[in-house]
Amino acid sequence: MTKTIIDQAGATPGAIRTREGLVSAYRTELAIAGAIVLLVLAVGTQVPQAMSWGNFANITQAGAPLIIMSLGVLLVVITGGIDLSVGSVFSLTGMVTAQAMASGLDVSAALIGLGVGLVFGSINGFLVTVAGLAPFVVTLITFAVAGSLAFIVTNGRSMPIGDPDFWLLNSGSLIPGVPNYILFCIVLLVVIEIFLKKMVAGRWFYAVGSSAAAARLLGIPVKRTQFFAYVASSLLASFSGLLTISYILNAESTAGSSLMLQAIAAVVIGGASLLGGTGTAVGAVLGALMITVIQNGVNLIGINSFWQGSVTGLAILIAVLIDRFSKSRRGAV
């Protein structure tokens, strides 16, 4: 009985995939992939440069930080929570790492940067699971605190990265011919997708998001699952920040100001519900790629960049309406 309820908590659990097939299980993700292709083709008719390999490389390079951050946000959203602090954690990580390197540390300063994510993720998890505060309130507070600290570290000044070897974290190649930023995205995608869909602990995330009370009755460690989700979200936000500063070799206190909205948008566009209980890593990655393609297209066509926020907001609205419509149809059936 326990396994049945946990299986029902996920949108496309393993048993359903086996029965209906891979295409049926990932039909939402396939639709998003198709939409991305259509977007690229549409922009390509206006700007042939959009179809070049160089532009595709730019899209993956620009999208990697958002992809990684979105995978972390996905874990929280599946459990029925929300993490508004990821953009500020992203910024603070960059500032702290840059300051540590300016103080004489080598690339090992990246560990201090990851420590920022660990600390803020633990604070979020503790306040949500132990103190019982609402995720929106908790992460709004840590969003403000981390954002403020990002300014305080250097009095709002940007910080250059003094060690050029730090660039290798992003653009080096642990595997010949494959840039690290692509490798990291692929590895995280595979690991998180397998964790969510094939491991018992991953199924707990869906169960908690579907009904925390029911999950608790089944003996699922609800608080531990939620705590892990917030820690993972902040750690991935920090890692995303490290990848960014290692590419541009500069840290800015406002670098992640727009990424929080984009990460949540990517998760929702990818098929996750803000009510919890559904979502896939594949969907989150495709959602992030769609946002990046839209931004890239806006720039290539020459549309005012200030419209990007409006386009992102519209994409969220459409995704939420589609999610609501699909749920109402399933309820009617």
Swiss-Prot record:
Q: Name one GO cellular component term.
A: plasma membrane
Q: What GO molecular functions are on record for this protein?
A: transmembrane transporter activity
Which Pfam families does the UniProt entry name for this protein? BPD_transp_2
Q: Which domain of life is it from?
A: Bacteria
The way this protein sits in the membrane is described as: Multi-pass membrane protein
- Tell me the InterPro entries matching this sequence: ABC_transp_permease (IPR001851)
What is the annotated localization of this protein? Cell inner membrane
**Record's family?**
Belongs to the binding-protein-dependent transport system permease family. AraH/RbsC subfamily.
* This protein's name: Probable ABC transporter permease protein y4mJ
